[in-house]
Amino acid sequence: MNYFELFKFSPAFDIDTALLAERYRELQRAVHPDKFANDTEQQKLLSVQRTAQVNDGFQTLKDPIRRAEHMLSLRGIELSHETTTVKDTGFLMQQMEWREALEDIRDSADPQASIDELYQSFAQYRAQLTQQLTQLLTSEQAEDALLAADQVRKLKFMAKLHDELTRVEDALLD
């Protein structure tokens, strides 16, 4: 299912999330199962299925990584359950540096400063990836779609690493 069509958006990485939320509420009102309480069982079932599609579509489009994965899936590139790893040597080196910095936080003289520095480094790198991804996803070239898939893989890794950093920060605050 094309969630962009469901929510009446052109397929694009950058979307108006406020408008997305508004359209979500409109769709929810239109397909909510309570609205079909007096209808046939088939209508009730269709309403439940449609509600699930609307919910899944909203969750997909509001999350940048899932939105990019959806855009790529519409082009025949499935990333959601893949195990392919990033082969970019520069990114792998950066990944190792971040992991080392993450491990060194507990022994740091100023753990919070180290955490803040890592958050800033993540934000800068993620902004670069997102900018590149936006450009690649607007292209119609098959090669650019494959490059976009690599950017999404990097963003997925960054999201996991960000979660790890948040856990380390929470543990230090306890």
Curated annotation (Swiss-Prot):
Q: Name one GO biological process term.
A: protein complex oligomerization
Q: What does this protein do?
A: Co-chaperone involved in the maturation of iron-sulfur cluster-containing proteins. Seems to help targeting proteins to be folded toward HscA.
Which gene is transcribed and translated to give this protein? hscB
Q: Which UniProt keywords apply?
A: Chaperone
Domain J, residue spans: 2-74
Protein's name according to its UniProt entry: Co-chaperone protein HscB homolog
Query: One Pfam family name from the record?
Result: HSCB_C
Q: Which InterPro entries match?
A: DnaJ_domain, HscB, HscB_C_sf, HscB_oligo_C, J_dom_sf
What interactions and quaternary structure are annotated?
Interacts with HscA and stimulates its ATPase activity.
* Sequence similarity: Belongs to the HscB family.
Q: Give the matching CDD domains.
A: DnaJ
Q: Does the keyword Transferase apply?
A: no
- GO MF terms, alphabetically ordered: ATPase activator activity; protein-folding chaperone binding
GO CC terms: iron-sulfur cluster transfer complex
